[in-house]
Amino acid sequence: MRTSQYLLSTQKETPADAEVISHQLMLRAGMIRKLASGLYTWLPTGVRVLKKVENIVREEMNNAGAIEVSMPVVQPADLWQESGRWEQYGPELLRFVDRGERPFVLGPTHEEVITDLIRGEINSYKQLPLNFFQIQTKFRDEVRPRFGVMRAREFLMKDAYSFHTTQESLQETYDAMYTAYSKIFSRMDLNFRAVLADTGSIGGSASHEFQVLAESGEDDIVFSTGSDYAANIEFAEALAPTEPRAPATEELRIVDTPNAKTIAELVEQFKLPIEKTVKTLLVHAHEESGHKLVALLVRGDHDLNEIKAEKLPQVAKPLTFASEEEIRAAIGAGPGSLGPVNLSLPVIADRSVAVMSDFGAGANIDGKHYFGINWERDLALPLVADLRNVVEGDISPDGKGTLQIKRGIEVGHIFQLGTKYSEAMKATVQGEDGRNQVMTMGCYGIGVSRVVAAAIEQNHDDRGIIWPDAIAPFQVAILPMNMHKSFRVKELAEELYTTLRSHGIDVILDDRKERPGVMFADMELIGVPHNIVIGDRNLDSEEVEYKNRRVGEKQMIKTSEIVEFLLSQIKR
């Protein structure tokens, strides 16, 4: 590619509305342009990277035995009603009607469509297992699109769906997808982790996320220092403390706390250790519990894990916190004065709360707290469950080592769906025993456009993007100095350009009539890994300058050795 015949579209200034570095650099490098909130046009440089990612994904999916299909973006509403997700999915599902007043959706995912297809095409266990994938545009009406293509409303995704008659068969395909995903992200030279995760709205029994480690990530990922345990913080179990509850040393007393409506204010004003305080959170109770609200207790320095709380049978789904009006109607006090003593509601305490002694909590009277609370003496120990997020230093759930926490960007997710969709949609085959059997399913997603942003978050400096070779828009940039005035510079540039292309190298020749500083800055900004600078002075000694974008080192290479040298440097 020649810059004179290419839309480079680089920008010097950082856009004011771009929050994260990947969004800033994708705009500055001329990869994307915003059309509307959460909607982006991909420019040539962006498309080149997107296609490189897409090709790696496709190759590894084919290697793993998956079969490519293409399904419509527009899906009839009756499939979503049949699966039960029409009501469950919420406002992120964009719904509309056609001219015949028939309801449709723009697909955020394709479980319903593929299940509908396969129940009409497959009728015997002999035809299974099968795994189908597509790389296609999806749409989710995000309430707050942000971070550029990281959380866009329209995005490119690889989604795959497998069908089986046994759990063992599903596990085999699940393991194959796990391996394929690991190969995909390894080929892209990304620093990633596969972590245990919650199944979320997709459903199912088991799931792993593939997280690219980056400080800008939205997810907290926990790792064990003593094993290969890794999980999303939403999923990680907080083990019960091993030490027994300390005996009571304080008397129960009620204290005036008119200016302490939060744990932080209570700790500051009364010099209490925060680990000696308890937060009482009221949420809506499950309708079958016979109560409107249920109280959840976590230690003052811990955060409630809403995913864990929502799974409790006593808690309504989705988890909803009680409003101040509901709290006052039930308790007679505001949210800042709640506590477990004399509380006339069902109570569930976190495991760490169950071993506390001499702790402080609200007195269920505005402006008052109890100090010196002790279980069994002042109130009965309630139901105990794992309610909190783990913190650094916790014992790993597998009992090996302690936990560390890092930030991650989710780029892939695999699920064992089981029969959630096939049962709801009556997707059956004739089993080995001659009877109809509901198929078991798995699903496997990669955010193709999100991978591009995640790679930038992990590979950049103050001059621009530093692409891994495998997904760079161009592998080599040829920068001829004053080629329009020097015949031998132009001749070598053209010869090198032709030769590299004949070797299958993606190369960009900067043939613009631009100052060298502009040419260097643009190639650094768009992240070309290998740069060759051709100048008259160096040609006197039959040399050119090579610069590696990642390490920043320059070295002189003989003109007769350039091609061989570049082929040895490029990771292919």
Curated annotation (Swiss-Prot):
Enzyme class per UniProt: ligase
Record GO biological process: prolyl-tRNA aminoacylation
GO cellular component terms, semicolon-separated: cytosol
The enzyme's E.C. designation: 6.1.1.15
Catalysed reactions, as listed in the record: tRNA(Pro) + L-proline + ATP = L-prolyl-tRNA(Pro) + AMP + diphosphate
Any one GO molecular-function label of the UniProt entry: aminoacyl-tRNA deacylase activity
Entry remark concerning the domains of this protein: Consists of three domains: the N-terminal catalytic domain, the editing domain and the C-terminal anticodon-binding domain.
Role according to the record: Catalyzes the attachment of proline to tRNA(Pro) in a two-step reaction: proline is first activated by ATP to form Pro-AMP and then transferred to the acceptor end of tRNA(Pro). As ProRS can inadvertently accommodate and process non-cognate amino acids such as alanine and cysteine, to avoid such errors it has two additional distinct editing activities against alanine. One activity is designated as 'pretransfer' editing and involves the tRNA(Pro)-independent hydrolysis of activated Ala-AMP.
Family (UniProt): Belongs to the class-II aminoacyl-tRNA synthetase family. ProS type 1 subfamily.
Record's protein name: Proline--tRNA ligase
